[in-house]
């Protein structure tokens, strides 16, 4: 017997070395454990409280335990109860035979002694014969416990687990619970101390060198010496064998339907075999006890088992495999473009799906077995130990599986991590996730190449510069979070392409786009005389990103985004006549948002544009813009976007073409750059990654100011704009809305656009076109020209001084109706739209009614001209109105038109007038079909929701 125990002891010590290697490392103690327990190796300690008094009448089991522990190398320690209690309480492992403390694994002598003092065991100990065997039995019991622990905790670094309170610590606790449950159930089932020690030792021997649950079941099969009627370890063995069988779901080539089927097959097989064994045993016990064993009892067992199997558990797993399949399909294209990240995601989904399927199948089986055994044992006193055993063991196994699942998930994630790191090692200087954005961009470029090649024709530009911002990609974000590499990922990347004569050019030699420094340089125009700079997607603000991954909880991490911002984009143009649409350049940054996502605090990125030579057009965006038009005829448009009404006051400007434009953007939605959080899950681990992107966010309104220099024309917004001109020659277009335009001094060109506008030419020879709507027009001093078209509405003109003209540019003079209404001359076109020239007859009537009245004003327009250059003078109007008793007869008007001498004279004047009208051809509003600057009409694939185009002028 001594040799046998020596061999067992040697084997047990060997099996414990794996766990002990981790236990022997020192480290920082848990704060909760107290300074008194700060040092000491991690080991097994037989703990005996100083004040513990064992019952000598029931044997000397405690003394035998102490002797056996000393021989087996187990430290025996008597401690103050308060110190151990602190450590046990801090880790939540009290009231069991085994406990986990900061100092190591505690084997509680009082708890073990209680087991040895159970009635049926204690009676055996009380005999003289059994007392002489006490030492051997105690040694056998302790060595068996050592062996079990050596397997349950194999490979665990308890020192690190205790310090970090990691997932492994929880798993270690669950392992101890399993060991406690086995010991308790064996103690409750055997009849003698010999049997208790023998069975503990057998179980420990069987578990030597077992690594994990996958082979635990096989080791338990055929375990001899266990009374089926008392312990039922064949049932436990079957349960663990079922856990092993479930791993067949790991076949990577199996289809989703096959995996789901395998899960059901496993559950049914385990349920069938185990429940059959349990049920037959329980029913036999019921018969022996004189209890019912009829059909209804068997039906109760079957129904309880069937309720425990839920197809919904497997449906969720099937979705995971379907996701992996769709990712693999999606990944094919990008793999050809040099990026395999989507395949890595699919690999992760399949790997974790397999784990989920395995654990779900096992837990389903365990739940079914526990339910079946409980139903079968109902009312059977004899069967209760079996029901308790199965219920306890299945619960502990489920706990171990759930906590093991996290480690398995991390194993799959680590493989993904290593592949990304290896790729970057083999591609020095490259970023794996940036490579993903490159592939996304190339695919987008391929999809839209036909459209892009047609842009030269559509935008009427010899060269088109297309700038594309690839924004945050959820798949790339998932991959970064899963692989714990969120610090390497970017919020996106900007790209530039050039197109000439329907050909795609390499833009890196033609255009400088530096998102880090905020530079856009398109000055290298070569031979191209016209170019259009198109921002296909919203361009994020300039600057560089840095990320920092920090732990916020046991399984929670966040990768914080830090942005080194540049306060402006600097745009440089060259000699070509260029068009810039800046409405897709993000200038507003949402610094703070409320719970509803509304922007409450903002920051702005300025745009500074130097246009150089050429006749340029700039469509201003949502923020402060500084424009130096340089040479050429340059126009600044506010007609795209919805960025508030203009207030322009150039009355104090000392340089022609200089303007300060104030805007107030009323509350509503506008393009903002905001920071959001992407969440990726790896089992219990939650990875949050901050990133920035553009979005139309609701805001409370804001002011912005633009500075314009060397600008020849300004086109207003759809709001109610105010224009106050300079002492120089100004060109204003009100756009939509009810606009107020004052040309001030200079020879101004003023266009109202849509809406009921008020336009005053001021001093100088002004060109005034009210546009659509019922406008109030005033020429002021100077030789002014007014224009009215069919569909423009009812206009009212007040004129004073100068040689003025009114052109009905699309009406024949003879089709108009002239009549006197009160003091005014009213001219009506064929659409019954009226142009009223205020106070035309007032001075003449005053002269008739007031003696010696001297006229002080000239409120008449000296010439009224039709579309073919035919005209009637103010003198002719007065004569024919008087002749027609307040209205010019059509016959008289026809005579005027047919007067060849007048027509000949009018041709020369008409040519001059046509030049004036054509010079205003750039005046346009967002809904005016006349002279609209070209913008793309085609659209990208609707699925690419982030892609936007230049809005219609």
From Swiss-Prot:
Q: Where does this polypeptide localize?
A: Secreted; Host cell membrane
Post-translational modification remark: Acylated by LktC. The toxin only becomes active when modified.
**Outcome of substituting residue 140 to I:** In strain: PH392
Q: Give the membrane topology.
A: Multi-pass membrane protein
Q: Which UniProt keywords apply?
A: Calcium, Cytolysis, Hemolysis, Host cell membrane, Host membrane, Lipoprotein, Membrane, Repeat, Secreted, Toxin, Transmembrane, Transmembrane helix, Virulence
Q: Which residues cross the membrane?
A: 230-250, 297-317, 359-379, 381-401
Annotated Gene Ontology cellular components are: extracellular region; host cell plasma membrane; membrane
- Principal subcellular localization: secreted
Query: Keyword Lipid metabolism, does the record have it?
Result: no
Q: Give the highest taxon in the source lineage.
A: Bacteria
Any one biological process term the GO annotation gives: killing of cells of another organism
Which Gene3D superfamilies does this chain map to? Serralysin-like metalloprotease, C-terminal
Q: Which cysteines are joined by disulfide bonds?
A: none
A GO molecular function assigned to this protein is:
toxin activity
A Pfam family (short name) is HemolysinCabind
Mark the Hemolysin-type calcium-binding repeats by their residue spans: 715-732, 733-750, 751-768, 769-786, 789-806
Relate the protein's function as given in its record: Pasteurella leukotoxins are exotoxins that attack host leukocytes and especially polymorphonuclear cells, by causing cell rupture. The leukotoxin binds to the host LFA-1 integrin and induces a signaling cascade leading to many biological effects, including tyrosine phosphorylation of the CD18 tail, elevation of the intracellular Ca(2+) and lysis of the host cell. This leukotoxin is a major contributor to the pathogenesis of lung injury in ovine pneumonic pasteurellosis. It also has weak hemolytic activity.
Something else the entry says is: The lktCABD operon has a complex mosaic structure that has been derived by extensive inter- and intraspecies horizontal DNA transfer and intragenic recombination events.
Q: Which family does it belong to?
A: Belongs to the RTX prokaryotic toxin (TC 1.C.11) family.
- Domains (record comment): The transmembrane domains are believed to be involved in pore formation in target cells. The Gly-rich region is probably involved in calcium binding, which is required for target cell-binding and cytolytic activity.
The entry's protein name is Leukotoxin
Which species is this UniProt entry from? Mannheimia haemolytica (Pasteurella haemolytica)
| Source organism phylogeny | Bacteria, Pseudomonadati, Pseudomonadota, Gammaproteobacteria, Pasteurellales
